[in-house]
């Protein structure tokens, strides 16, 4: 397995992309790049600066002054905003419910995609998001599109919130996830959609281990070529 490939994992909100991508990256000793965390960090920075997130010009000013870095912690990946650890605060419902608005702006996405492509230049990466296979890494050797029902995804996010000590309402989460799906798939710039050459993986009734196993067997097939 000397070959260093790029693996793109796309899918809607709370489909389990990040969880699976982290495990796959660890199994392969690859770098994991969480593009969702990059948009979350930008959203957090904009909210902290009380910027109008519907205003692209104001957001671009934030983007220009934001340095986002990843570091491997003991059991998880840490996210830093201008040197400050923001790994936890970017996961609050406040940020979660606004990240799709920030991500819809053309200039914002163009700059973020440029940064993401920069991080992936040398290969040996697992990257997850909404438009990785279609836009960020169109030449990735492995492309996965993960799906799960709104109900299943809301349940997962609900448990995640409770485990982190956040208030959580399951019915409200179902509505919010459906709304994020709508925003992500209908936006003009790089909408959420399956790449033509991506393999679709419905994770509704699968465990994390089963999903990882399926992806690893796809990767093994690529290495065998």
From Swiss-Prot:
GO molecular function: ATP binding; CMP kinase activity; dCMP kinase activity
Keywords per UniProt: ATP-binding, Cytoplasm, Kinase, Nucleotide-binding, Transferase
Record InterPro entries: Cytidylate_kin (IPR003136), Cytidylate_kinase_dom (IPR011994), P-loop_NTPase (IPR027417)
Catalytic activity: CMP + ATP = CDP + ADP; dCMP + ATP = dCDP + ADP
GO biological process: nucleobase-containing small molecule interconversion; pyrimidine nucleotide metabolic process
Enzyme class: transferase
Top-level lineage group: Bacteria
Binding-site residues for ATP, renumbered to this chain: 11-19
Entry EC number(s): 2.7.4.25
Locations listed in the record: Cytoplasm
One GO cellular component term: cytosol
CDD domains: CMPK
NCBIfam families linked to this entry: cmk
Protein family per UniProt: Belongs to the cytidylate kinase family. Type 1 subfamily.
Name of the protein in question: Cytidylate kinase
Provenance organism: Bacillus cereus (strain G9842)
